[in-house]
Amino acid sequence: MEQKRLTHLRQLEAESIHIIREVAAEFANPVMLYSIGKDSSVMLHLARKAFYPGTLPFPLLHVDTGWKFREMYAFRDRTANAYGCELLVHKNPEGVAMGINPFVHGSAKHTDIMKTEGLKQALNKYGFDAAFGGARRDEEKSRAKERIYSFRDRFHRWDPKNQRPELWRNYNGQINKGESIRVFPLSNWTEQDIWQYIWLENIDIVPLYLAAERPVLERDGMLMMVDDDRIDLQPGEVIKKRMVRFRTLGCWPLTGAVESHAQTLPEIIEEMLVSTTSERQGRMIDRDQAGSMELKKRQGYF
């Protein structure tokens, strides 16, 4: 079909499927990073379309910090079972032994040890040479300048000044021994595109994205949902039930909710049309320091 006859979402869908198939054909041992969020759900849906009626030719990898929302863990296992996907779960054993957690050690150290180092451990353990991620360019400024094929050296580090041109949808996947790439099939999607596609394709998502009355407290300008009894209440903090939802998901002590009454996908889409803030405004890890996301990516983050 001619491109001009495709709708905006179908053009994005076709581009993403093309990228996923290219990587599966080019690389010896790819993997799909599965963080359980809305972007991961869309990426998995696209991958299933890309190889239908066959099964995925690569596994899913979840780097577990031990601090995800309980609903996320339940959704992860349910999804993998429903689709017959091979699911690999890796948790940094050194971090577990040290008792690393976001309350005691802070967001920067927790993220570095449990996510960045955990990811690098898993990639090395299984020898993956390409890893799909659900990052989008509209999310954050360092991601805006990252290529679809994001090359990493043998230490998994990203050099933003040493990126390859990507002209006419041609991607250069040649790598040397020990090197790898991170692949972002959703690079050109926006948050609004993601939600419209989820509605169009009836994609299952974690219920936390929909507004409901949940136990939250205010801390550091963020609405923190109290998901289990590991909460470390500070003087003056009070847990209250409020109507909230999440625009992005991560470790529950580091992910802020937003007040909302959007309980359906059309209501979320309508809410996004008038939103003037980034979906990552509630991610504590983005506040560590100026340029913190780029620094994390240089060190091997997603």
From Swiss-Prot:
The keyword Ribonucleoprotein is annotated on this UniProt entry: no
InterPro entries, per database record: PAPS_reduct_dom, Rossmann-like_a/b/a_fold, SO4_adenylTrfase_ssu, Sulfate_adenylyltrnsfr_sub2
A GO term, aspect molecular function: sulfate adenylyltransferase (ATP) activity
Alphabetical list of Pfam families matching this protein: PAPS_reduct
EC class of the enzyme, as a word: transferase
Source taxon at top rank: Bacteria
Transmembrane segments: none
Entry annotated with the keyword Electron transport: no
Known EC number: 2.7.7.4
Swiss-Prot/TrEMBL catalytic activity: sulfate + ATP + H(+) = adenosine 5'-phosphosulfate + diphosphate
Pathway terms, separated by semicolons: Sulfur metabolism; hydrogen sulfide biosynthesis; sulfite from sulfate: step 1/3
SUPFAM superfamilies according to UniProt: Adenine nucleotide alpha hydrolases-like (SSF52402)
Keywords of the record: ATP-binding, Nucleotide-binding, Nucleotidyltransferase, Transferase
GO terms under biological process: hydrogen sulfide biosynthetic process; sulfate assimilation
Subunit structure: Heterodimer composed of CysD, the smaller subunit, and CysN.
Function in brief: With CysN forms the ATP sulfurylase (ATPS) that catalyzes the adenylation of sulfate producing adenosine 5'-phosphosulfate (APS) and diphosphate, the first enzymatic step in sulfur assimilation pathway. APS synthesis involves the formation of a high-energy phosphoric-sulfuric acid anhydride bond driven by GTP hydrolysis by CysN coupled to ATP hydrolysis by CysD.
Assigned protein family: Belongs to the PAPS reductase family. CysD subfamily.
Name of the protein: Sulfate adenylyltransferase subunit 2
Organism: Salmonella schwarzengrund (strain CVM19633)
